[in-house]
Curated annotation (Swiss-Prot):
Protein name: DNA gyrase subunit B
Gene: gyrB
Keywords: ATP-binding, Cytoplasm, DNA-binding, Isomerase, Nucleotide-binding, Topoisomerase
EC id: 5.6.2.2
Gene Ontology MF terms in the entry: ATP binding; DNA binding; DNA topoisomerase type II (double strand cut, ATP-hydrolyzing) activity
Record's function text: A type II topoisomerase that negatively supercoils closed circular double-stranded (ds) DNA in an ATP-dependent manner to modulate DNA topology and maintain chromosomes in an underwound state. Negative supercoiling favors strand separation, and DNA replication, transcription, recombination and repair, all of which involve strand separation. Also able to catalyze the interconversion of other topological isomers of dsDNA rings, including catenanes and knotted rings. Type II topoisomerases break and join 2 DNA strands simultaneously in an ATP-dependent manner.
C-alpha cells in the first residue's frame, strides 16, 4: 500500500480513460494467493470481477486494444515507449522493465542499478565532464523523499530535469527552486571561503553556476499539488524547503570532501562569469557605436547597396591597402568590403573575454549584425549570406 502513496497516473485518470477509449481491455490480477480476471468492451464491463485460480504471484497484467472508432491511427511508436520506459527505469533503481515489439521481433531490457547516477551518465555521454557524479538520496522529516544526481561538463548549456512521483515537470516548480537556491548558496560559500571571488575580481550569478550542469531532481511526495492537470509544474510549497535543506547539507559536504572537483567547478563558474561580463561589454560597445553611427556599422566597412542578405556578399581583406584595391574592383550593388589587420587573434585558444576585447573581432561582430551573447545572438540577423 505504501507504494501507492507516491504514485501518479495520466492526469489523474489513468486506466479509466484508457478503458473508455479501447474497444477491448482485459485485466489479470495476481493478489493474495488468487488470480482475478475482468474484461471490458468500449468501457463497459462484460462480467463481474471473478477468481479464475490460485497463484503465488503478485502483480497486474493489462492488455488493451485502442478503438478505431475513436482513433484514426492505432499504430504504437516504439521510440516514444522506449524513451519513457528508460526514464522510469532510471528513476526507479533496480526495477527491471522489458519492452517487446512483436511486430518486428524486438526486445529491450531496462535495468539501471545506479538510478539517477546512470541517468546523468546517459545524458552526458560523449561530453567531457569536470567532476564525478554527485548523487544522494534522503528521506526528510516531512515525509518527502529527495534524490538528486548532478555533474558539470564542458558545454555551455544547463540541462536540469525535474520529476515528482516519476512524473516529469518540464516547467520545474518548487523542487527546482529549492535545488537552485541550495546549489547557488553552496557554491557561493565555497568561492568565498577559498577567497576565489576576490582573487579573480568577478561577481557570479546563479546562471554562471549552472552553465554546463546536468542534473536530475526526483522527489516522492505523498500529496503533490500541480499548477494544472498536465502536472507540468509542481506548486507544493512544502517541497522547496525539503529539497533545499537536503541539497544544502549533502552538496556542501561534497565540495569539502572533493577539493579537486570543487576547484574544477569553480574554474568553470569563473569562466562563465567572465564570458557573461565580456558579452555585456560587447553589447554595450555595439549599442554605443550604433548611437554614434546612424547605420551602426564599422567605419572601414564599404557596404553594398543591396539590402537582401541572400543577395549580399561580404569580402574580408587584409589591411587598408588591399581594402582600397578591393573597393575599386567590386560590384557596389551586391559586394561589401571590410579591411582587417592581419592575423587578428586565434579565437580557438583565446578566452572569451580576451576575444571580445579585440577591436577587429568587435568590428566583425558589428558588421555581421548577429549580435553576441546568449540573450542577443540571432543568426537570422546575418547581413550577408555569402562571406569570403
Amino acid at each position: 500500500d505504501n507504494s501507492y502513496k507516491v504514485s501518479g497516473g495520466l492526469h489523474g485518470v489513468g486506466v479509466s480513460v484508457v478503458n473508455a477509449l479501447s474497444k477491448k481491455l482485459h485485466l489479470i490480477i495476481h493478489r493474495a494467493g488468487q488470480t482475478h480476471e475482468q474484461e471490458y468492451c468500449h468501457g463497459d464491463s462484460q462480467y463481474p470481477l471473478k477468481v479464475i485460480g490460485e497463484t503465488d504471484k503478485s502483480g497486474t497484467v493489462i492488455r488493451f486494444w485502442p478503438s478505431e472508432l475513436t482513433f484514426s491511427q492505432t499504430i504504437f511508436s516504439v521510440e516514444i515507449l522506449a524513451r519513457r520506459l528508460r526514464e522510469l527505469s532510471f528513476l526507479n533503481a533496480g526495477v527491471r522493465i522489458v519492452l517487446r515489439d512483436e511486430r518486428v521481433n524486438f526486445e529491450h531490457v531496462y535495468d539501471y542499478e545506479g538510478g539517477l547516477s546512470e541517468f546523468v551518465k546517459y545524458i552526458n555521454e560523449g561530453k567531457t565532464h569536470l567532476n564525478e557524479i554527485f548523487h544522494f538520496t534522503t528521506d526528510t522529516d516531512s515525509g518527502i523523499a529527495v534524490e538528486v544526481a548532478l555533474q558539470w561538463n564542458e558545454s555551455y548549456q544547463e540541462n536540469v530535469r525535474c520529476f515528482t512521483n516519476n512524473i516529469p515537470q518540464k516547467d520545474g516548480g518548487t523542487h527546482l527552486a529549492g535545488f537552485r537556491a541550495a546549489l547557488t548558496r553552496g557554491l557561493n560559500q565555497y568561492l568565498e571561503s577559498e577567497n576565489i571571488l576576490k582573487k579573480e575580481k568577478v561577481a557570479v550569478t546563479g546562471d554562471d553556476a549552472r552553465e554546463g550542469l546536468t542534473a536530475i531532481i526526483s522527489v516522492k511526495v505523498p500529496d503533490p499539488k500541480f499548477s494544472s492537470q498536465t502536472k507540468e509544474k509542481l506548486v507544493s510549497s512544502e517541497v522547496k524547503p525539503a529539497v533545499e535543506q537536503a541539497m544544502n547539507k549533502e552538496f556542501s559536504a561534497y565540495l569539502l570532501e572533493n577539493p579537486q572537483a570543487a576547484k574544477s567547478i569553480a574554474g568553470k563558474i569563473i569562466d562563465a562569469a567572465r564570458a557573461r561580463d565580456a558579452a555585456r561589454k560587447a553589447r554595450e560597445m555595439t549599442r554605443r557605436k550604433s548611437a554614434l553611427d546612424i547605420a551602426g556599422l564599422p567605419g572601414k566597412l564599404a557596404d553594398c547597396q543591396e539590402k537582401d542578405p541572400a543577395l549580399s556578399e561580404l569580402y574580408l581583406v587584409e589591411g587598408d591597402s588591399a581594402g582600397g584595391s578591393a573597393k575599386q574592383g567590386r560590384n557596389r550593388k551586391m559586394q561589401a568590403i571590410l579591411p582587417l589587420k592581419g592575423k587578428i587573434l586565434n579565437v580557438e585558444r583565446a578566452r572569451f573575454d580576451k576575444m571580445i576585447s579585440s577591436q577587429e573581432v568587435g568590428t566583425l561582430i558589428t558588421a555581421l549584425g548577429c549580435g553576441i551573447g546568449r540573450e542577443e545572438y540571432n543568426p537570422d540577423k546575418l547581413r550577408y549570406h555569402k562571406i569570403i
